[in-house]
């Protein structure tokens, strides 16, 4: 069971980071249709961030104070997952947000009271992924060499993202039982990630 405030603080800052990354991509994309699709995804991340912030405020806590312990680590994660061009960065947001949203939805089941269902519904809401996938598919179709580069980049992203997921777990200190508890969750996350990559025609 995750501790409520650290869970909310980390989840909120991750959504804020996703919004910032997508906003940067909007400024780098030339095609107006693609800009709109990425902007919609950025708006969805911001809405999720604001929803989590509302939960923090509902408890009478300051969102900045609750997010602060996670800022440096997530900022570092953002640097690691910023691509060499906007297409790599867009895939990075799709991969990392997909994995982490799925992960935090699963963790939400352990939150007290009715917070868990609210957060799970919020994180599971439409995040504009269909539009992002459309943009990526168009780019891959226009550049035959892009697919292999993005596939390799996507594989690298998974390891860094799962480290962030592990940092959100409340572990008992018993390595064997902790691993037994974590393994099924991570197996499900990887399966969902593989389906997303397959939808782009990329090898996970």
Predicted region positions:
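Amphipathic, well-ordered alpha-helical segments in soluble domains
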Residues: 14-22, 48, 69, 96-103, ...
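Extended alpha-helical coiled-coil scaffold domains characteristic of the BAR superfamily
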Residues: 15, 89-101, 186, 190-201
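Helix-loop segments that flank and shape redox-cofactor active sites
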Residues: 18-39, 81, 97-112
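Acidic/His metal-coordination segments adjacent to aromatic residues that form catalytic metal sites
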Residues: 1-9, 70-93
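A contiguous pocket-lining binding segment that forms or flanks enzyme active sites
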Residues: 105-162
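Conserved alpha-helical segments that form or flank metal/cofactor-binding pockets of metalloenzymes
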Residues: 41-70
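Extended, helix-rich structural scaffolds rather than catalytic motifs
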Residues: 146-204
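Alpha-helical scaffold segments that form or flank carboxylate-/histidine-based iron centers
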Residues: 3-8, 32-47, 89-90, 114-131, ...
């Amino acid at each position: 069971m995750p501790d409520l405030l650290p869970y909310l603080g980390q989840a909120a800052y991750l959504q804020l980071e996703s919004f910032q990354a997508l906003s940067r991509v909007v400024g780098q994309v030339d095609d107006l249709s693609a800009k709109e699709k990425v902007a919609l995804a950025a708006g969805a991340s911001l809405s999720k961030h604001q929803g989590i912030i509302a939960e923090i405020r509902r408890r009478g806590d300051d969102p900045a104070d609750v997010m602060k312990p996670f800022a440096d680590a997530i900022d570092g994660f953002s640097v690691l997952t910023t691509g060499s061009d906007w297409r790599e960065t867009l895939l990075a947001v799709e991969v990392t947000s997909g994995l982490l949203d799925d992960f935090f939805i699963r963790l939400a089941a352990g939150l007290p009271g009715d917070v868990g269902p609210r957060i799970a519904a919020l994180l599971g809401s439409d995040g504009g992924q269909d539009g992002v996938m459309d943009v990526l598919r168009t780019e891959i179709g226009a550049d035959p060499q892009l697919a292999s580069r993005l596939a390799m980049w996507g594989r690298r992203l998974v390891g860094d993202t799962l480290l962030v997921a592990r940092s959100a777990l409340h572990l008992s200190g018993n390595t064997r039982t902790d691993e037994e508890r974590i393994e099924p969750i991570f197996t499900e996350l990887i399966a969902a990630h593989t389906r997303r990559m397959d939808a782009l025609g990329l090898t996970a």
